[in-house]
Amino acid sequence: MELTSLGAVGYRADGKPGALLVLAHGAGAGQQHPFMTAVAKGFAARGVDVVTFDFPYMRERRKIPDKAPVLEKAFVEVVTAARQWSGATRCFIGGKSMGGRMATHLGAAHLDDLSGIVVFGYPLHPPGKPDQLRVAHLGSITVPVLIIQGERDAFGTPRELKPAIETITAKVTLHIVAKGDHSLSVTGRRRDEVLDEVIDVAVAWIRAGSGPFSK
């Protein structure tokens, strides 16, 4: 199946791609949200092929996200098509908030030939409900994980997140955005400056697991 038939968008890397990243959106905004497009373009400019997509509920303009099995199935379909489109030998998956959580679900399900997971703002719990943790699957993840978390994230601060991270047997890297919120926005800093920081962190992490590449 091709990317276009799935409503996915591919961002070609500058130069030969060193890796592929399939990036899923958060619960409230689709792949055309400025965060998603800026991050995708930033990775591509640094030598990583990127594919974004909309989950079924977003394509159908429904407000309530689909159940996890539906989201996971859609994610897997896009990963399969993205691998054919890219040709990169290393495949990473990830996403913003809910999309990142779904990526960890696929990592826990042992998706074939997965190199790692990149999460921008893991939604550990709903805001104001720290007892409703979304962590049961984390201990089953067997691939490296990078979590980029705002220091003031209402869905889970880095301090709250650390006990959950310790249940993951694979290597986990936690990058904290000082004074950042769940959207990784920081008062007093330009949005593009913060995004450049987190993209640089993520690309360096991908390079470390992929070897050198062109950008």
Task: Label each region the model flagged.
Residues 167-184:
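Catalytic histidine neighborhood in serine/cysteine hydrolases
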Residues 75-143:
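Primarily recognizes the serine-hydrolase "nucleophile elbow" in alpha/beta-hydrolase
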Residues 1-91, 109, 181-187:
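Serine-hydrolase catalytic machinery in alpha/beta-hydrolase-like enzymes
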Residues 180, 188-215:
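Catalytic active-site module of serine/aspartate enzymes centered on a nucleophile-bearing elbow/loop
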Residues 151-155, 182-183:
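Acidic catalytic loop of the alpha/beta-hydrolase fold
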Residues 141-142, 147-149, 153:
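Short beta-strand/loop motif that positions the catalytic acidic residue
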Residues 36, 134, 143, 157-165:
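Short alpha-helix in the alpha/beta-hydrolase fold that links the catalytic acid
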Residues 22-26, 121, 149:
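The conserved beta1-alpha1 loop
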